């Protein structure tokens, strides 16, 4: 295994542990929404997409996350609004990630979406 691959594996294992140990509040199901969120800052090469995907899955949210050519990350997240708010707050709380700007816009929900994926 190359040194960089080893580093990524250690980082990814840490990301998974962080998500698994995070304490989730009791959520009250509220409005079902879909949001397109664009993040800028130190959000690439830090496990951001993996962490967002794992936490979104744990929160029973659907959608996708992808890197942007300008160094940002974009996600569409669908589910109950309180869970999406928690996800965004969780991502802002991570020390190795520095979100400088976050644009959060509503978009139309998608029927039949069943998972959250990294694209």
Place the predicted regions along the sequence by residue.
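Intrinsically disordered, low-complexity, mixed-charge
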Residues: 1-119
């Amino acid at each position: 295994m190359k040194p960089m691959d080893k580093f990524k594996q250690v980082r990814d294992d840490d990301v998974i542990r962080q998500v698994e140990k995070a304490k989730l509040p009791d959520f009250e199901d509220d409005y079902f929404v879909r949001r397109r969120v664009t993040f800028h800052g130190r959000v690439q090469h830090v496990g951001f997409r993996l962490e967002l995907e794992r936490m979104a899955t744990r929160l029973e949210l659907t959608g996708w996350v992808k890197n942007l050519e300008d160094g940002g990350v974009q996600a569409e997240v669908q589910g109950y609004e309180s869970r999406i708010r928690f996800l965004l707050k969780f991502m802002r709380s991570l020390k190795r990630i520095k979100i400088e700007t976050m644009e959060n816009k509503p978009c139309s929900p998608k029927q039949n979406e069943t998972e959250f994926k990294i694209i």
